[in-house]
């Protein structure tokens, strides 16, 4: 159950950011939009790391319990698990790039903003575009990982 809640937490945060927060800030004046998006980004990072930790812990626990019970299915199950772990790993790498590569640059650029910002600075906009691309990739990979997880429960 914890595994499912953690998946919903991470994917829900991604979907909220893409469907609600991202489009909503476009209606705001640039400085407020930038600060709102940056605050949302740091919140999503926190929620995502909590979910990733829960997914790792509960996934390992589930695997150990299954192994100790001697109910490890065959080769097809192993292939499904490998595919799911590959997708999960890719999502964690993407999230790490967002947090450790783009996040600090965006935070620094936001902190350097003048009092009045008539438009998005190109340097900041460029960073956000890269950040959002990784978020969209994770939004595509996440449901596939969930479907693989469901397939694992059927075997």
Residue ranges and their predicted role:
Residues 1-155:
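Polytopic transmembrane helical bundles with strong interfacial aromatic enrichment
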């Amino acid at each position: 159950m914890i595994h499912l809640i953690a998946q919903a937490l991470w994917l829900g945060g991604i979907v909220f950011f893409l469907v609600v927060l991202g489009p909503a800030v476009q209606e705001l004046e640039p400085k407020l939009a930038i600060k709102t998006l940056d605050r949302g980004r740091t919140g999503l990072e926190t929620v995502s790391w909590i979910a990733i930790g829960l997914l790792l812990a509960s996934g390992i626990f589930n695997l150990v319990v299954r192994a100790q019970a001697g109910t490890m299915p065959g080769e097809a199950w192993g292939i499904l698990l490998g595919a799911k772990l590959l997708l999960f790993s890719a999502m964690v790498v993407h999230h790490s790039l967002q947090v450790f590569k783009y996040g600090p640059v965006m935070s620094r650029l936001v902190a350097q903003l003048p009092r009045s910002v008539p438009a998005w600075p190109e340097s900041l906009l460029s960073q956000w575009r890269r950040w959002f691309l990784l978020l969209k990739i994770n939004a595509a990979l996440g449901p596939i990982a969930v479907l693989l997880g469901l397939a694992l429960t059927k075997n």
